[in-house]
Amino acid sequence: MNKVYSLKYCPVTGGLIVVSELASRVIKKTCRRLTHILLAGIPAVYLYYPQISQAGIVRSDIAYQIYRDFAENKGLFVPGATDIPVYDKDGKLVGRLDKAPMADFSSVSSNGVATLVSPQYIVSVKHNGGYQSVSFGNGKNTYSLVDRNNHSSVDFHAPRLNKLVTEVIPSAITSEGTKANAYKDTERYTAFYRVGSGTQYTKDKDGNLVKVAGGYAFKTGGTTGVPLISDATIVSNPGQTYNPVNGPLPDYGAPGDSGSPLFAYDEQQKKWVIVAVLRAYAGINGATNWWNVIPTDYLNQVMQDDFDAPVDFVSGLPPLNWTYDKTSGTGTLSQGSKNWTMHGQKDNDLNAGKNLVFSGQNGAIVLKDSVTQGAGYLEFKDSYTVSAESGKTWTGAGIITDKGTNVTWKVNGVAGDNLHKLGEGTLTINGTGVNPGGLKTGDGTVVLNQQADTAGNVQAFSSVNLASGRPTVVLGDARQVNPDNISWGYRGGKLDLNGNAVTFTRLQAADYGAVITNNAQQKSRLLLDLKAQDTNVSVPIGSISPFGGTGTPGNLYSMILNGQTRFYILKSASYGNTLWGNSLNDPAQWEFVGTDKNKAVQTVKDRILAGRAKQPVIFHGQLTGNMDVTIPQLPGGRKVILDGSVNLPEGTLSEDSGTLIFQGHPVIHASVSGSAPVSLNQKDWENRQFIMKTLSLKDADFHLSRNASLNSDIKSDNSHITLGSDRVFVDKNDGTGNYVILEEGTSVPDTVNDRSQYEGNITLDHNSTLDIGSRFTGGIEAYDSAVSITSPDVLLTAPGAFAGSSLTVHDGGHLTALNGLFSDGHIQAGKNSKITLSGTPVKDTANQYAPAVYLTDGYDLTGDNATLEITRGAHASGDIHASAASTVTIGSDTPAELASAETTASAFAGSLLEGYNAAFNGAITGGRADVSMHNALWTLGGDSAIHTLTVRNSRISSEGDRTFRTLTVNKLDATGSDFVLRTDLKNADKINVTEKATGSDNSLNVSFMKDPAQGQSLNIPLVTAPAGTSAEMFKAGTRMIGFSRVTPTLHVDTSGGNTKWILDGFKAEADKAAAAKADSFMNAGYKNFMTEVNNLNKRMGDLRDTNGDAGAWARIMSGAGSADGGYSDNYTHVQVGFDKKHELDGVDLFTGVTMTYTDSSADSHAFSGKTKSVGGGLYASALFESGAYIDLIGKYIHHDNDYTGNFAGLGTKHYNTHSWYAGAETGYRYHLTEETFIEPQAELVYGAVSGKTFRWKDGDMDLSMKNRDFSPLIGRTGIELGKTFSGKDWSVTARAGTSWQFDLLNNGETVLRDASGEKRIKGEKDSRMLFNVGMNAQIKDNMRFGLEFEKSAFGKYNVDNAVNANFRYMF
């Protein structure tokens, strides 16, 4: 490339053109040439590279940052983005990029003069004759041109590179080439974008130009209009900067943009393609650009010329032998009699190396010599194994493994050379010993499975670099490569740990594309012991100005004094004159470090490394898969920042004794005038997600900062957790590939979507602290720790526990708890804060809540406008103290359905609600709270004083111990509510209203704690209100308490300057409904007795159908019954036994023993519960030859009962009972035929059922209920009809029957007692009709099986259905 140029006047164009001063008579030739390409009289000028001259010209009313971001795919312009808005500097919409998804410009070289169109080829204009190398992506790579491939007649060339490019994906090439008018087809080509570099200008609407930067400082890009001419050349007028036809971001290419690409979106192929390279422009004040369309035929031929003949392996023959002569640069691959000639590097000519393509399944190659293939690469169409004789190596441009192939590579490389790998297929590294070469991979999978040599040494590569976002490297084991020599370049790739334990002491990751993962079933362990730093430190030496100047503190400078070069380290940002006043002697400005250059450089380098060792570590990449990650204590207390992402669904990330920060990532922008790509004060950040099973913190400081969401449980041991932290770090070199330069600061998001989010359960131990300043969903368990809330969006969805731990909702915070909470301390609420205690929303329902319990030591409302809300199925306990004007809401005026409880805790909470929407148990003190109740229950836990009380359809009661309560209210407004007070006939609970009382339809109920004497007058004041209060505000209410309906007798006294409601006495009567429920509960034992009775004689009945001998048997029965009052039960009954046959004169006597187990449950309007019964007995059955029989049985049963009553405050009771049974049955089997019989029966069962007594309190009233032992006597008469069916070796007896079962004695008496007296409920008799049908079958000579179905009807208690199956084995 000519770097010496000048501006010359051209008489043909009438303007200046740029020419090389090394060219011969260029001016005359150029002027003539331009006469053939004038458009609308505008001169065209060649665009020479890299002449520092005019270049991209863009609109001045759009921020220059937009054009910079566009060119580098940064900011809004990420590849694939759609409908991108473009605004001017005033915030007005200029237009939208809505004709195509955003293009990916990564294939454009870093300097903008060439574009990668194949892994080894770029395109540009041939008059760019001086550049010798290109780089891509973040520019941290260099590829040399080995052949320029200049077109003979067109200003175009397609240089070949020395290696396969791994960092980026080549651009797709237009399929239409130079076809006439191809790119004027707006239906197929919907958008045209360009990118280039050079001297930068902006233009206003008046055409005034302002220089922005010198040539090749950076790239800009933008839109161009549909071509005016489209053939071998594309011509358009992007210099008409404000013409809408050029799109919202017009960019006019000028000198310095030579060779830069023009892309078009091919709607037909749904992709962007490169169509041309920029050749000329019409002058700085012109408008027209000329592009040379890609000559696709020429390009294809150029690439084809670099291939040797393809090699086709023949299966079944020996491997291909590869020999190579380094001197001649040629080699031979031979298989049998067939040979293929190949060409490699000759002397220093890399381009002499040709590409080889291999095909043939399961191919094999053996290198007989070391091969130096130069710029030639290997491409495998099929799977191959490539090996080498001892010590033989291969170098070249790289390897391509096509999709679906697996190439096993057993050849080591050369130190200082990298093996470049592309292609979607797999490359398995399987050599031996230490491979000194490196790996750069840009696509597909590389499996590192190097084998150890005889000395045990193994190394697959000296270094590994992943780039482009496409490749995966799989570690065969942890020894394959030094992890610290693994790096991720532009857009990165995946490192698969493959179940291994790997330790990194440094992470070299350029961007978010860097991924460490584990896809193996065996969990990997990743240790990030980040101690080491990049030792590649550059120490530039600046010159000291004798007149003073500015510089960078810490940098090295030199000055020649007295013929000797002296070296200094600058200590300040500026320094003074060194001629007089000599600032070099000022230690605040300079530090002298000697005259030895090497020692001075080393001093600075050591200080830089020492500083880096203390710097925080930031990882921009991703941690994913099946692994645990551990960050141990790092030297110097180094902080670790993750602004990439973590996805470890079954993994644990552990941090020990350090600072760990999860944060979002600032959107990277292109640099303008030296600006950093990111900053602390920028508004646009990318969200990042962190998912893991557990985050484990020990002695750590953890921050979840803006734009980060964490989904994980957290285990904290003596650690500090900040959710919603404003602490962030930005990398001033983010996206550049340069060494990380971190800047710490604060950043507060402006929108809700930019705030951090947490979901999970946190456990705090050993003085841990949790500060919640952002959205929180989950649970908290705190032990000897502290929790502070400032976020307005904290949702506790799991039960909360705070033991020895504080919970504070600070100013503006809002805590919503949905699943219960326990705290042994007070919960604090600050100014404008809110605490909401609610039931648990039922999934997939609109407005259902399961009850929940909140048990705390209290609530302190310390800030003005603090709010405590107890609602939708919540029962809260704990005193409330309002030291500031605050609000307490209990219940809700919005209907909410309380769902049936699915857990014990929820059932308990539901019982405490007593049918109300919400409930509170405790005192409210301080006198400053405004309390409102809607469909709510407040149980006064102590004397209370509040400012205002609004009550709607609610109840306020005073229950608990025998201490009387006083409720003092400044203003009371109550409607449709109950006020329940207590009295011991001397004193009582009281309500005092000091300022105003209003309302109506309220009932005043009074519970007495001992029986009042007959006719006793009490005269006890209950409610005191200001004079003038309506006497109709309270009416005496009737309350069902215990087994009675109690109504106080009141009178209203308006004397003494106030209005009082005074208790005179009581009127009590029995509550028949409660008594009936109690009787039903107490009679559950009778129903259990009947269950056993119905199964008592089943075994003896079977004997009459078996004609068997001694044997063992088993039976299982299942049934369900029902009775009045919503009663229903079901049971499963198991019997096992053994009996023996005694043959006597005219009679067969069977005697046996049985054991039984019954599991039953019952439910009714009054109660629900379960009984487990275990018993045993003896039985005998006499079968007479005449057909008569007698059955006898005695049995004992023990019952273990758990029942919950929903009447009179009974609650759950666990108790044991027992019962005895003595049964006798007789009957006669008449045979109508040999197979058919009829059998009349009579049975009598006498039993004993133990009694039970329960004592408890309903409020302050003592209650008891009792039934004594009783002895049922039950008779049954009936008839059965049966028939036996038999064959050669089988028989089946089928039977059906009906009978009448009846009680001969009344059931036991129930005695109920409460404060109003004793009530006796006499036992009753019951009877029912029984129906049964069944069969008994002989399976083998000594085995029988029986099945029977039963049902009853017409009784107060009936068996709805029952089935029993039995099995007998006879000896």
From Swiss-Prot:
Q: Where is the active site?
A: H127, D155, S258
Question: Per its UniProt record, what InterPro entries does this chain match?
Answer: Autotransporte_beta, Autotransporte_beta_dom_sf, Autotransporter_pectin_lyase_C, Bact_Autotransporter_VF, OM_autotransptr_brl_dom, Pectin_lyase_fold/virulence, Peptidase_S6, Peptidase_S6_dom
How is the protein altered post-translationally, as described in the entry? Cleaved to release the mature protein from the outer membrane.
One Pfam entry name: Peptidase_S6
* Record domain Autotransporter: where: 1105-1371
Gene Ontology terms describing biological process:
proteolysis
Which residue range or ranges hold the Peptidase S6 domain?
A: 56-301
A single Gene Ontology MF term assigned here is: serine-type endopeptidase activity
Q: Name one GO cellular component term.
A: extracellular region
> CDD domains given for it?
PL1_Passenger_AT
Enzyme Commission (EC) number: 3.4.21.-
Q: Which residues form the signal peptide?
A: 1-55
Q: Which SUPFAM superfamilies has this protein been placed in?
A: Autotransporter, Pectin lyase-like
Q: Per its UniProt record, what PROSITE patterns does this chain match?
A: AUTOTRANSPORTER (PS51208), PEPTIDASE_S6 (PS51691)
Q: Which UniProt keywords apply?
A: Cell outer membrane, Hydrolase, Membrane, Periplasm, Protease, Secreted, Serine protease, Signal, Transmembrane, Transmembrane beta strand, Virulence, Zymogen
**Is Protein transport among the key words of this record?**
no
Marked site, Cleavage, at N1094, N1095
Write down the PANTHER family for this protein, in alphabetical order: AUTOTRANSPORTER, HEME_HEMOPEXIN-BINDING PROTEIN
> What free text does the record give on domains?
The signal peptide, cleaved at the inner membrane, guides the autotransporter protein to the periplasmic space. Then, insertion of the C-terminal translocator domain in the outer membrane forms a hydrophilic pore for the translocation of the passenger domain to the bacterial cell surface, with subsequent cleavage.
* Task performed by this protein: Involved in virulence of uropathogenic E.coli although it is not known how it contributes to it. Has no mucinase activity.
Protein name, as recorded: Serine protease pic autotransporter
What's the source species for this entry? Escherichia coli O6:H1 (strain CFT073 / ATCC 700928 / UPEC)
Q: What is the lineage of its organism?
A: Bacteria, Pseudomonadati, Pseudomonadota, Gammaproteobacteria, Enterobacterales
